[in-house]
C-alpha cells in the first residue's frame, strides 16, 4: 500500500459519514423499509459520492416509490402488469452464486428465445416498463436480504443468453428503441445492481447490435459487460458454484426448477383496444417539430385527483410531467413531478396513470429530441378517473394541436 493510500477502514468510515449525510437529508421522505446502509451507498456510488446530486436524485426516486407504493407488500404495488412480458419474456432469479456467504445474485435472461415481433405487438409501453420494474423490485428484495445476512454490499451477475436469436429487419429498431429505453429507465431507479452483465451464445452479427447500442451505454457500465467466448460454461463456473447454476449453463440445478419456459406469443395476446379506452380518433394530435418541444397545461382543482393519460406515438418522443401552484411560470420554475420518459413508437395505445397530490397546474412536456429533420405527432387525451370525463388542456386551441373527436353519447 502506498504511504498516503487510504486503508479499507478509512474508506469505510468515509462511506459511513457520507451515508449519514444523505440519510439525514432524505429522512422526511424515505420509508424505513428502504432505508439501509447499502441502498444509500448504491446511490452515492452511482453519483461519484456527490452528496447534493445524490440527495436530489434519491428524493425523486423515493417520491416515485411512494407514488407506486413500492415499499408496501408486493400485492399493494401500483405498478402495471404485463402478461405478455411476464409469461413470454421472463427474467429468472436463480439465487446467490455461492452455497454459503454468496454476495452475487445470479439472474438469467434468455433474450435470444423471445418472440420479439410478437412481444412488440402485444405490450403497451408503460406496462412493459412496469413489468421490468417488478422484476427489479424482486431482485432488490433478494439483494437486501443477502446484505442483511452477509453484512456486505451485494450485486448480481446478469446472464444474458442470446441462444436462438434470429436476425430480422426489425431487430435493430427494437434494440435501439424499446430495449435501450427500458434499460435506461431501469438504470435511473436501480443503481449499482449489476457486477457483471455476461453475454453468452452471441450470434455472428453481435458487432452490428453492439454498434447500435454502445453509444448509449455509459463507460462505467461498458466495463461491466462481458462477452463470453465459446468456453462460456467454464467462464461461468469461475464465478458461480456449480450447485448454484441451472444445468444448461453447466450447473446442477434442474432447468425445470429454476427456468421458466420462453414460448412464442399467441396472436390472441396481440394488443387490441379495450372497450373502456377512448378510440384513436378521440385523442388530440400534437405536432412537435424536430429538436423542439411542446407544453400542454392542465388545471387540477382537487387534491389526490387521479388522471389517466391515454397516448400513442409512432416515433420516439420524450415526455416529462411538471407541477406548479401557479399558471404563468417559466419552465425553470416548474417542479419536476415525473422525470423524463423516452417513449418508443409501438402499435398499442399507452396508458399512464398519475395521482395529482396537490391542486394546481400540471404541465406535460413533449420533446422531439430524437429527430433532427422530421416532426413527430403525439396523440393524447387525459381523463379524470373518478368522473370519467376528459380534462382538457387549457391551451387546446393552439394551432399545433388538432382536436380529437368528441365521444358519442350513448
From Swiss-Prot:
- Residue ranges annotated for the CRAL-TRIO domain, each copy included: 81-257
The record's listing under SUPFAM superfamilies reads: CRAL/TRIO domain, CRAL/TRIO N-terminal domain
Which CDD domains does UniProt cross-reference here? SEC14 (cd00170)
Pfam families cross-referenced by the UniProt entry: CRAL_TRIO
- Kindly provide the name given to this protein in its UniProt entry: CRAL-TRIO domain-containing protein F28H7.8
The organism named in the record is Caenorhabditis elegans
Query: Top-down, what is the taxonomic lineage of the species of origin?
Result: Eukaryota, Metazoa, Ecdysozoa, Nematoda, Chromadorea
Amino acid at each position: 500500500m502506498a504511504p498516503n493510500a487510504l486503508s479499507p477502514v478509512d474508506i469505510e468510515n468515509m462511506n459511513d459519514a457520507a451515508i449519514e449525510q444523505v440519510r439525514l437529508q432524505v429522512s422526511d421522505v424515505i420509508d424505513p423499509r428502504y432505508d439501509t446502509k447499502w441502498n444509500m451507498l448504491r446511490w452515492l456510488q452511482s453519483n461519484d459520492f456527490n452528496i447534493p446530486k445524490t440527495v436530489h436524485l434519491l428524493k425523486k426516486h423515493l417520491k416515485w416509490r411512494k407514488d407506486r407504493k413500492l415499499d408496501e407488500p408486493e400485492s399493494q404495488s401500483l405498478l402495471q402488469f404485463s402478461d405478455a412480458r411476464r409469461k413470454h419474456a421472463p427474467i429468472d432469479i436463480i439465487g446467490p452464486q455461492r452455497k454459503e456467504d454468496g454476495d452475487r445474485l445470479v439472474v438469467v435472461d434468455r433474450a435470444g428465445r423471445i418472440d420479439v415481433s410478437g412481444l412488440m405487438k402485444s405490450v403497451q409501453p408503460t406496462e412493459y416498463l412496469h413489468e421490468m420494474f417488478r422484476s427489479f423490485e424482486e431482485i432488490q428484495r433478494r439483494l437486501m436480504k443477502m446484505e442483511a445476512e452477509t453484512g456486505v454490499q451485494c450485486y448480481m451477475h446478469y446472464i444474458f443468453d442470446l441462444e436462438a436469436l434470429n436476425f430480422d429487419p426489425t431487430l435493430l429498431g427494437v434494440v435501439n428503441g424499446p430495449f435501450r429505453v427500458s434499460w435506461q429507465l431501469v438504470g435511473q431507479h436501480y443503481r449499482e445492481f449489476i457486477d457483471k452483465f455476461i453475454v453468452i451464445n452471441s450470434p455472428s452479427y453481435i458487432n452490428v447490435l453492439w454498434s447500435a447500442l454502445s453509444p448509449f451505454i455509459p463507460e462505467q457500465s461498458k466495463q461491466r459487460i462481458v462477452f463470453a467466448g465459446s468456453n462460456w460454461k467454464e467462464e461461468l463456473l469461475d464465478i458461480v458454484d456449480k450447485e448454484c447454476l441451472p444445468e444448461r449453463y453447466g450447473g446442477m440445478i434442474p432447468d425445470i426448477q429454476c427456468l421458466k419456459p420462453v414460448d412464442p406469443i399467441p396472436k390472441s395476446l396481440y394488443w387490441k383496444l379495450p372497450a373502456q379506452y377512448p378510440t384513436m380518433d378521440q385523442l388530440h394530435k400534437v405536432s412537435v417539430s424536430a429538436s423542439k418541444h411542446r407544453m400542454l397545461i392542465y388545471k387540477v382543482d382537487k387534491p389526490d385527483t387521479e388522471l389517466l393519460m391515454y397516448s400513442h406515438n409512432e416515433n420516439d418522443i420524450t415526455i416529462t410531467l411538471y407541477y406548479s401552484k401557479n399558471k404563468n411560470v417559466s419552465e425553470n420554475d416548474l417542479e419536476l413531478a415525473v422525470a423524463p420518459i423516452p417513449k418508443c413508437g409501438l402499435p398499442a395505445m399507452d396508458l399512464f396513470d398519475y395521482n395529482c397530490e396537490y391542486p394546481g397546474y400540471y404541465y406535460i412536456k413533449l420533446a422531439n429530441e430524437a429527430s433532427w429533420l422530421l416532426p413527430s405527432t403525439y396523440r393524447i387525451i387525459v381523463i379524470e378517473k373518478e368522473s370519467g370525463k376528459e380534462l382538457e388542456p387549457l391551451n387546446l386551441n393552439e394551432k399545433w394541436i388538432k382536436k380529437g373527436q368528441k365521444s358519442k353519447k350513448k
